[in-house]
């Protein structure tokens, strides 16, 4: 991800996420042409990149149906307009690749318990193989949390995604009892049932790739507070979702609570999530869709205040949904571009106890007529993950302050060479190494004076590869 430097101070580490919804083609894809779908996604990600968004939660399992080839479940109807039809490409792989090109994390959003209408392909396929696994509530099918194999099935599904794809996270949605479910067990037993499912998924993905984050989107209010009531709709009691307990137990790396509220329905419950985060990541979901006149017609000030408080509290932010954000509803995109004046890295997974990578051993800078050409090498990973990432910093002050987000010009970069347009300036550079857990090495610095002393390289030589 290449970005321009700005003067506004923003945190160096902060989750800035969006939910990219595929069900019913709400955010993407908007057409059934594979070519147009790819162009649409590129346009969306370019917009997100310009607003310094660093995490995309893409809905990959929709309703027992997928946007990628799977032996377990059929293609979702959103891809071609026909359920089960192959669109001719792997949309999840394409999204991962395009996110990584832009220095963004890509998390596979997995809708867990709901499996769609009773007679849809995905629901029927599971019922045919496992007749006791799906329960009908009204016209909808749901995986039964009280069947032990539900956790096994979902763990197998998430393991398959983790093994086959370079996802940065598995994001569980609806990991709870449905609100329409007639609970026949105690609330405590219901919570144990859901927690058992989470444990199985956690074990499965960490056995494959321990750096892959496991997260979920819990109901926005965990439970009643001493001074503020949840109005009967909360995670812990209403739907048996002990999300704070999952952080405490260490079987969840991050939470994205669906905090689609304002005022006293928002701020006290934000404080509660922070107080019980146990050192893990929390990035509350904000209801940017509520800004739309056909929804609640909120004023932009509601979202603006919430974003300011979340930043002051050291929490991340997640937007629901992507289209309302990129459509600049009530100016939310414009505000966010200014608010996120500098890029940010994802907070490191320090609880995994991994030793950070060794820094690069060499950093060379050559100067052409238009760009500084950086090359580096010699870094070493200590985490056992599959590859390293690099962050590049630039400043007119030496040494470059790598703790200042304003100096970060390229984040989560896979290569070991970069051309930086210098526009006639003499800049100092620093490169750090980052492992898949987000641990960052010490910086290798290069002085601008060294650049000025080098022979100027004709840009025409660069074009012909000399």
Regions found by a protein language model. Give the residues of each.
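Active-site-adjacent "subsite" loops/lids of carbohydrate-active enzymes
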Residues: 13, 19-39, 92, 96-97, ...
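Catalytic domains of carbohydrate-active enzymes, especially glycoside hydrolases
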Residues: 39-66, 164-169
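Aromatic-lined carbohydrate-binding/catalytic grooves of carbohydrate-active enzymes
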Residues: 51-87
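Aromatic- and acidic-residue-enriched segments that line the glycan-binding/catalytic groove
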Residues: 66-81, 114-138, 175, 180-188, ...
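Substrate-binding cleft of secreted/luminal carbohydrate-active enzymes
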Residues: 243-244, 248-266, 280-353
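Pro/Thr/Ser/Gly-rich low-complexity, intrinsically disordered linker/stalk tracts
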Residues: 331-384, 437-466
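Beta-strand-rich modules
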Residues: 419-441
């Amino acid at each position: 991800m290449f970005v321009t430097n700005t003067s506004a101070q923003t945190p160096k580490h902060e989750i800035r996420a969006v939910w990219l919804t595929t069900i019913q083609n709400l955010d993407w894809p908007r057409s059934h042409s594979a070519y147009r779908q790819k162009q649409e996604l590129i346009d969306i990600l370019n917009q997100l990149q310009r607003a310094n968004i660093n995490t995309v939660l893409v809905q990959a399992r929709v309703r027992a149906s997928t946007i990628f080839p799977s032996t377990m479940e059929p293609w979702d109807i959103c891809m071609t307009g026909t359920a089960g039809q192959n669109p001719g490409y792997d949309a999840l792989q394409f999204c991962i690749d395009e996110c990584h090109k832009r220095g963004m994390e890509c998390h596979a959003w997995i809708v867990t318990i709901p499996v769609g209408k009773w007679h849809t392909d995905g629901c029927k396929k599971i019922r045919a193989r496992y007749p006791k696994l799906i329960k009908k509530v009204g016209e909808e099918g749901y995986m039964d949390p009280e069947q032990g194999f539900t956790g096994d099935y979902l763990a197998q599904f998430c393991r398959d995604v983790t093994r086959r794809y370079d996802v940065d996270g598995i994001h569980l949605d609806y990991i709870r009892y449905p609100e329409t479910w007639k609970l026949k067990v105690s609330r405590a037993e219901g919570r144990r049932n859901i927690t058992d499912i989470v444990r199985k998924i956690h074990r499965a993905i960490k056995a494959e790739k321990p750096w892959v984050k496991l997260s979920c989107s819990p109901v926005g209010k965990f439970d009643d507070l001493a001074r503020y009531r949840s109005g009967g709709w909360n995670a812990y009691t209403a739907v048996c979702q002990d999300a704070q307990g999952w952080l405490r137990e260490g079987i969840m790396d991050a939470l994205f609570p669906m905090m689609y509220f304002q005022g006293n329905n928002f701020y006290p419950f934000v404080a509660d999530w922070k107080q019980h985060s146990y050192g893990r990541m929390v990035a509350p979901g904000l209801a940017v869709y509520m800004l739309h006149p056909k929804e609640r017609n909120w004023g932009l000030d509601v979202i603006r205040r919430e974003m300011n408080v979340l930043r002051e509290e050291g929490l991340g932010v997640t937007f629901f949904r992507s289209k309302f954000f990129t459509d600049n509803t009530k100016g939310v995109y414009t505000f966010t571009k200014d608010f996120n004046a500098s890029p940010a890295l994802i907070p490191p997974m320090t609880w995994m106890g991994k030793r950070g990578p060794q820094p690069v051993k060499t950093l060379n800078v050559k100067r052409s007529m238009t760009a500084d050409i950086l090359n580096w090498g010699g870094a070493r990973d200590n985490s056992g993950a599959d590859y390293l990432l690099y962050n590049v910093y630039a400043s007119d002050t030496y040494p470059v302050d790598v703790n200042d987000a304003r100096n970060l010009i390229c984040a989560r970069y896979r290569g070991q060479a970069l051309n930086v347009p210098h526009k006639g300036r003499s800049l100092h550079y620093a490169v750090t190494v980052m492992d898949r857990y987000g641990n960052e090495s010490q910086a290798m610095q290069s002085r601008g004076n060294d650049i000025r002393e080098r022979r100027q390289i004709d840009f025409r030589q660069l074009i012909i590869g000399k």
